[in-house]
Regions:
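Hydrophobic transmembrane alpha-helices that form the pore/transport pathway of multi-pass ion
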Residues: 204-272, 282-285, 291, 461-492, ...
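Core transmembrane alpha-helical segments of multi-pass membrane transporters/permeases
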Residues: 120, 125, 135-150, 158-159, ...
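Transmembrane alpha-helix interface/packing and boundary motifs in multi-pass membrane proteins
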Residues: 191-195, 226-235, 267-273, 358, ...
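Membrane-interface helix termini and inter-helical loops of multi-pass transporters
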Residues: 39-40, 93-100, 162-163, 420-436, ...
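Membrane-interfacial loop-to-helix junctions in multi-pass transporters
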Residues: 104-109, 171-183, 209-223, 254-260, ...
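Long, contiguous bundles of hydrophobic transmembrane helices that form the permeation core
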Residues: 2-19, 299-402, 505-591
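Hydrophobic or amphipathic alpha-helical targeting/insertion segments
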Residues: 73-84, 90-95, 108-167
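Conserved, well-structured core domains of diverse proteins
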Residues: 1-98, 108-112, 626
Length: 629
C-alpha cells in the first residue's frame, strides 16, 4: 500500500491547503496589478520582484490531481528555495541599487536556485523549447570564451552572471517583466472578465446575425467573432478552445469538412494577436522596446490585419462556392434580443473607453483599469449569473493563471537578454546575420522569418518575439527597415507559428473539437492564412501600409491594389486544382516583392489567365479558335 493510500487525510489536507494558497496568491496578483494600474508604480523593485514571486508561487500551488509524493515534495522544495531567494534579494536590494554590495557565496547559490525554479516553472507553463534556449544561453555565458572565432567572448564568472541575471534589472527582472506586471496583466484581467461575463457568446451571435446570411456564413461569422475576441484574449490556443467549441461544429453543420472548419477557427484565432486595438500582450512590449506610443502601434497594425482577415473571408467564399453551399434563410438566423444588445455593451463600451482614453493621452494601464471597472459594473448590472461569488472566483483565478504563465515566460526570456547584453552576443548575431545574407534585405527577412517560425512553434508569441527581435532586429534595421516594420514583421511570424506544422499548437487545439487530423488542419490553416506570411514582406517593402512611417499616398494605394490582387489570386486560384493553386501562390509572392515592371507583368498575366479560364468555362474559347482559323 502506497503512502497516499495509507494517509489519505494527509493528501486531502495538502490539496485543500494548495487550493487556499492558490486563491490567496491569485487575489494578491490581481489586486496588485489593478492597484499599480490605478495609482502607478511607487517601488520598481517591489513591483518586479513581487510580481514574479507571486506568479511563481501561483504555479507552485496550482491545484493538482497528482497523488505522487515525490511531486508534492519537489513542489515544496522549489517553493522553499524560491522564497529563500526572494527573502535574500529583499535583504540586499537597497545595497545592490547603490552599488555598495558584493555577492557572497550564499547569494550565488540562492541566485542559481532561483533561476532553476524560474526555468522549471517556464517548462511547466510554456514547454521545453524556451528552457533549452535559456540553458544554451547560460552555457554560452559560462563557456563561450572557449569557442573561438566570432562567437568567442572575454569570459563571464558566476558572480557576474548571477549579478546580471538575478540581482539586477538586466536579466530576469528586466523591462519586459515590468511591462507585464504594470500593463499586460491588467488586459489579461480585462479579457478574462469579458469571457466570464459572456461577451464571447454575444459577439458570436452578433457576427452570425451580421454575416450568417452569406454563402458559408457560419465560417464568416466565426472569423469575425474570433478576430474581435482574439484581440482581447491574446492567446490563439485559448481562443480556439473558448470559441471553437461553438464555431467549429456550427461550421461543419453548414457543409464544410471538419478539417476546413478547424483550419478556419485556428487561423482566425491566431490572427487575433495582430488585430487592434489590444493585440494580446505583444503590442505593449513593442511600445516599450521601440518607444513608439501604443496607439500608434495599433494604427500601424490596422491595414495589415484587415488584409489578413480579408483573405480569410475570400478563401471561405471560394470554398463555399466550390462545395455548392447555399445561402441560409435569413429567418433562421439567430436574432439579437434586447438583452443581447445590452450585454454587447459589456464589450463595446469598455473597448471604446480604452480607445478614447488612449487618444486623450492616458496610459494603457489606466485605460485598462477603467475598462475593467466599467465592464464589471455593466456585467453585474445586466448579468445575474455574474453576481455570484463563484463567477468572481473563476474570473480571478483564470486571470491569475494566465498572468503567471506569461510572467515566467518573460522572466525566462530575461535570462537570454541578460546573457546577450553581458557577452555582446546580440551584436555578434547581427554581424553573422548580415554576413549570411550578404547585405540582401530579402535574405535577412527570410532568415528572420524562419527563426521566428522555429522558435514560435514551441513557445508563446511574446517570448518568441522578444528573442528574435533582440537578436536579429538590429541587423534588419541596419539595412534600412523602419523600426516599427521590423518589429511587426517578427510579430507576424511569431503569430503564424501557431498554425505552422509540425507543432501548430492552434491546429492541435482545433483538431480535438473538429474530429479531424491535426496535421491536416494545420496544412489547411496555412493555406487559408497565406496572406499572413506575405503581408509582413509587403509592409517592409512598402512602409506606407503601416500608416505611421514614411507614408506616401501613391505607394499606399499601389500596395493595396497589389495585395488585393494577391488575395484574389490566392483564394480564387486555390479552388481550381493544384496547378492553379501553385500559380496563384507564385503570383502572390511576386506581387509582394519589389519591382514595378515585375508587378505589372504579374497582374497582366493574372488578368489574362482569368479571362481565358472564363472563356473556356463558358464554351466560347472554342468559338474564338474556330473564328481565328
Amino acid at each position: 500500500m502506497t503512502l497516499p493510500e495509507r494517509l489519505p487525510w494527509l493528501f486531502l489536507a495538502a490539496s485543500r491547503l494548495r487550493q487556499a494558497l492558490f486563491l490567496l496568491f491569485a487575489v494578491i496578483l490581481v489586486a496588485g496589478a489593478l492597484y499599480t494600474a490605478r495609482f502607478g508604480v511607487y517601488n520598481e523593485t517591489l513591483v518586479r520582484v513581487g510580481g514574479l514571486g507571486i506568479g511563481i508561487l501561483l504555479l507552485l500551488t496550482r491545484p493538482s490531481t497528482t497523488r505522487h509524493l515525490a511531486r508534492l515534495l519537489l513542489d515544496l522544495a522549489l517553493t522553499a528555495l524560491f522564497v529563500a531567494a526572494l527573502v535574500r534579494y529583499s535583504m540586499i536590494a537597497n545595497m545592490l541599487e547603490f552599488g555598495l554590495y558584493f555577492l557572497v557565496p550564499i547569494d550565488v547559490v540562492l541566485g542559481v536556485g532561483a533561476l532553476v525554479v524560474v526555468l522549471e516553472m517556464a517548462r511547466r507553463a510554456v514547454g521545453l523549447p524556451l528552457v533549452l534556449v535559456c540553458l544554451v544561453a547560460i552555457g554560452y555565458a559560462l563557456f563561450g570564451q572557449h569557442l573561438g572565432g566570432m562567437l568567442s567572448h572575454s569570459g563571464v564568472d558566476m558572480d557576474s552572471l548571477m549579478l546580471t541575471l538575478w540581482y539586477s534589472f538586466d536579466g530576469v527582472f528586466g523591462r519586459p517583466l515590468a511591462v507585464v506586471v504594470g500593463t499586460i496583466i491588467v488586459f489579461i484581467i480585462f479579457g478574462t472578465l469579458l469571457e466570464a461575463l459572456g461577451a464571447g457568446d454575444v459577439l458570436l451571435k452578433l457576427a452570425m446575425r451580421g454575416l450568417g446570411w452569406l454563402r458559408g456564413g457560419a465560417a464568416h461569422a466565426a472569423v469575425l467573432a474570433s478576430a474581435l475576441f482574439g484581440s482581447v484574449s491574446g492567446s490563439a490556443v485559448a481562443n480556439v478552445v473558448g470559441t471553437g467549441v461553438v464555431t467549429i461544429p456550427m461550421i461543419k453543420r453548414t457543409g464544410f469538412s471538419g478539417r476546413f472548419a478547424g483550419a478556419v477557427e485556428a487561423s482566425a484565432s491566431s490572427g487575433g494577436q495582430i488585430m487592434p486595438p489590444i493585440m494580446g500582450a505583444v503590442a505593449f512590449i513593442m511600445a516599450d522596446l521601440t518607444g513608439i506610443p501604443y496607439l500608434y502601434i495599433c494604427l500601424a497594425a490596422l491595414i495589415p490585419a484587415l488584409l489578413y482577415y480579408g483573405s480569410l473571408f475570400a478563401c471561405i467564399s471560394v470554398e463555399a462556392k466550390r462545395l455548392n453551399i447555399e445561402r441560409p434563410d435569413r429567418a433562421l438566423l439567430p436574432r439579437m434580443t434586447g438583452r443581447d444588445w445590452l450585454m454587447l455593451s459589456t464589450f463595446v463600451v469598455p473597448l471604446g473607453l480604452i480607445i478614447g482614453m488612449l487618444m486623450l493621452g492616458s496610459s494603457p494601464a489606466r485605460a485598462g483599469f477603467m475598462a475593467i471597472a466599467v465592464a464589471l459594473g455593466l456585467g453585474l448590472l445586466l448579468n445575474r449569473e455574474a453576481r455570484s461569488l463563484k463567477a468572481l472566483q473563476v474570473a480571478v483565478t483564470g486571470a491569475a493563471s494566465a498572468s503567471a504563465k506569461i510572467l515566467v515566460a518573460v522572466a525566462a526570456v530575461g535570462i537570454v537578454v541578460g546573457v546577450m547584453n553581458l557577452t555582446g552576443l546580440g551584436l555578434r548575431f547581427a554581424s553573422a546575420a548580415q554576413a549570411l545574407s550578404d547585405g540582401s534585405l530579402l535574405m535577412s527577412l527570410i532568415v528572420m522569418a524562419m527563426a521566428c517560425l522555429m522558435l514560435g512553434m514551441g513557445m508563446p508569441t511574446v517570448p518568441a518575439y522578444l528573442i528574435i527581435i533582440l537578436v536579429m532586429g538590429p541587423a534588419v534595421e541596419a539595412l534600412g527597415v523602419p523600426t516599427i516594420a521590423a518589429h511587426m514583421f517578427v510579430v507576424y511570424f511569431a503569430v503564424m507559428s501557431a498554425i505552422t506544422p509540425p507543432v501548430a499548437l492552434a491546429g492541435y487545439a482545433a483538431a480535438s473539437i473538429a474530429d479531424a487530423s491535426p496535421m491536416g488542419i494545420s496544412v489547411t490553416a496555412v493555406r487559408l492564412a497565406l496572406m499572413g506570411f506575405l503581408v509582413p514582406f509587403a509592409f517592409v517593402y512598402s512602409p506606407s501600409l503601416l500608416l505611421i512611417t514614411d507614408f506616401a499616398l501613391g505607394e499606399f494605394v499601389w500596395a493595396l491594389l497589389r495585395l488585393g490582387a494577391a488575395i484574389w489570386m490566392l483564394a480564387l486560384f486555390a479552388g481550381r486544382g493544384h496547378l492553379w493553386a501553385i500559380a496563384g501562390m507564385l503570383g502572390a509572392i511576386l506581387l509582394v516583392l519589389p519591382g514595378l515592371y515585375l508587378q505589372i507583368g504579374v497582374l497582366a498575366l493574372a488578368v489574362l489567365a482569368e479571362a481565358l479560364y472564363r472563356l473556356r468555362k463558358s464554351g466560347r474559347f472554342g468559338q474564338l479558335n474556330s473564328l481565328s482559323l
